[in-house]
Structure formats: C-alpha cells, structure tokens
A protein has these predicted regions:
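Conserved acidic residues
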Residues: 49
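Short, well-ordered coil/turn elements that cap or connect secondary structure elements
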Residues: 30, 62-64
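Short, polar loop motifs at secondary-structure junctions
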Residues: 39-40, 52-59
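Structural signal for conserved beta-strand scaffold positions within catalytic alpha/beta enzyme cores
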Residues: 5, 37, 53, 68-71
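Conserved active-site segments centered on acidic
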Residues: 2-39
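Acidic, metal-coordinating helix/loop segments flanking the phosphotransfer/catalytic sites
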Residues: 41-46
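Ser/Thr/Gly-rich flexible loops in soluble cytosolic domains mediating phosphotransfer, phosphorylation
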Residues: 66-93
Length: 93
C-alpha cells in the first residue's frame, strides 16, 4: 500500500503529516506501507492508494474518494481515527 501526504509546497505540513501517519499506522499494527510527502502540484503522477492531507486543502480534491482529510496534522490520534474510518469504509481493515 502507498500513502501520499500532501500539502501546498510538499515541505512543512506534509512532512509532519507523514510522521503522524507513520505513527498512526504503527499504532494500528499496519506494516509494509510506503508513506511519502509531496506537494499538491507533483502528486498527480504518483501511484498511490490513499492521499492524506489537511482539511484546508479540501477544495483541491473535488470528487475524489481516495482522500483522507485531517484537521490537525500534528495529532497522531486524530490522523489514526481518520485513517481507521477511511480504511474500514474501503474494506482495507
């Protein structure tokens, strides 16, 4: 499975989000997941299963069903809850 963490520039918040996603996955006992952080402009060419991004970027992803939106990218427990909800809904858990 591949998860990409996306922000406007692909540096600050996406890197923090990547670390939160990795922590959440570890807590969930999910292994063998490739997690990357990228900018919104460079993500289109990347293969991925799930996109994780901040709630602020909701308008950047209209009509997509592969996106998990998170309000606070620093809080691993919030990221974990959002990922669990998404993965259960998609039959990935």
């Amino acid at each position: 499975m591949k998860i990409i963490c996306v922000c406007g520039m692909g540096l600050g918040s996406s890197l923090i989000l990547k670390m939160s996603v990795e922590t959440a996955l570890k807590q969930m006992g999910i292994k063998d997941v490739d997690v990357e952080h990228v900018s919104a402009g460079t993500m289109e060419g990347l293969n991925h299963d799930i996109i994780v991004t901040a709630e602020d970027f909701r308008d950047e992803f209209p009509g997509r069903d592969d996106v998990v939106f998170v309000r606070n990218v620093v809080k691993a427990d919030e990221v974990k809850a959002a990922l669990e909800e998404y993965m259960k809904a998609k039959g990935l858990l």
